[in-house]
């Protein structure tokens, strides 16, 4: 048991080392896009399933409240939170439409969709991306493995943050770190701090 625990730490560390080489440019570009979106008076919508739904909520909470510095709230909405809406859409239409219908109602040109799926193949996240594109939104995707079908929907205006791993747990761990990097860069770009203080 102890060895399995130690192995999990070691694998997580190695995946983060690999990601530290592969992901900084994508994360920086995504953060720049998000800053531009927010400065333009737009918002960020986020979606995912299971642990990725938790990540979407974590991201929106950090923007709506604060990350590490005192600042005004920033507009972000996790589309996985409204159980009445989600269950109504799933019951009346399809589970694949639980995010896309919300995006058709809430998404505006200039908004960003943060689409999260460890496999890149979640049907409802793919439909969300299609809806976002139809609303002239840009997309930041957080994926892993080979990027799945989500990778094929992205244009040069979008950003893919693809974790270099095939292990779901390791991908989720790096997704959380990437989200924290996004929040940190958004905060320090919009609200520069005196590092000497």
Curated annotation (Swiss-Prot):
It is found in: Cytoplasm. The keyword Cytoplasm applies. Zn(2+) binds at residues 58, 62, 172, 180. Binds 1 zinc ion per subunit. InterPro entries: GmhA/DiaA (IPR035461), Phosphoheptose_Isoase (IPR004515), SIS_dom (IPR001347), SIS_dom_sf (IPR046348), SIS_GmhA/DiaA_subfam (IPR050099). Its cofactor is Zn(2+). CDD domains: SIS_GmhA. Substrate binds at residues 49-51, 62, 91-92, 117-119, 122, 172. One of its GO terms (biological process) is carbohydrate metabolic process. GO terms for molecular function: carbohydrate derivative binding; D-sedoheptulose 7-phosphate isomerase activity; zinc ion binding. Residues 34-196 form the SIS domain. Its EC number is 5.3.1.28. It catalyses: 2 D-sedoheptulose 7-phosphate = D-glycero-alpha-D-manno-heptose 7-phosphate + D-glycero-beta-D-manno-heptose 7-phosphate. Pathway: Carbohydrate biosynthesis; D-glycero-D-manno-heptose 7-phosphate biosynthesis; D-glycero-alpha-D-manno-heptose 7-phosphate and D-glycero-beta-D-manno-heptose 7-phosphate from sedoheptulose 7-phosphate: step 1/1. Keywords: Carbohydrate metabolism, Cytoplasm, Isomerase, Metal-binding, Zinc. One of its GO terms (cellular component) is cytoplasm. Coiled coil: none annotated. Gene3D superfamilies: Glucose-6-phosphate isomerase like protein, domain 1 (3.40.50.10490). Homotetramer. Catalyzes the isomerization of sedoheptulose 7-phosphate in D-glycero-D-manno-heptose 7-phosphate. Belongs to the SIS family. GmhA subfamily. The reaction produces a racemic mixture of D-glycero-alpha-D-manno-heptose 7-phosphate and D-glycero-beta-D-manno-heptose 7-phosphate. PANTHER family: DNAA INITIATOR-ASSOCIATING PROTEIN DIAA (PTHR30390:SF6), SEDOHEPTULOSE 7-PHOSPHATE ISOMERASE / DNAA INITIATOR-ASSOCIATING FACTOR FOR REPLICATION INITIATION (PTHR30390). This is Phosphoheptose isomerase. The gene is gmhA.
């Amino acid at each position: 048991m102890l060895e399995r625990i130690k192995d999990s730490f070691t694998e997580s560390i190695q995946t983060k080392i690999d990601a530290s080489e592969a992901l900084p440019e994508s994360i920086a570009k995504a953060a720049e896009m998000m800053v531009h979106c927010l400065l333009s008076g737009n918002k960020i919508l986020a979606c995912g399933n299971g642990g990725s739904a938790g990540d979407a909520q974590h991201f929106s909470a950090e923007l709506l409240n604060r990350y590490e510095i005192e600042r005004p709230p920033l507009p972000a909405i996790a589309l996985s939170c409204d159980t009445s809406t989600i269950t109504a859409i799933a019951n009346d239409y399809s589970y694949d439409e639980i995010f896309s219908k919300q995006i058709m109602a809430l998404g505006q040109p200039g908004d960003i969709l943060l689409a999260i799926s460890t496999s890149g193949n979640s049907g409802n996240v793919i439909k969300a991306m299609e809806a976002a594109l139809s609303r002239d939104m840009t997309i930041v995707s957080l994926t892993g493995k080979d990027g799945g079908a989500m990778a094929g929907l992205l244009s040069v205006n979008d950003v893919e943050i693809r974790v270099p791993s095939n292990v779901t747990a390791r991908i989720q761990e790096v997704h959380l770190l990437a989200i924290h990097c996004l929040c940190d860069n958004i905060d320090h770009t919009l609200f520069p701090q005196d590092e000497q203080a």
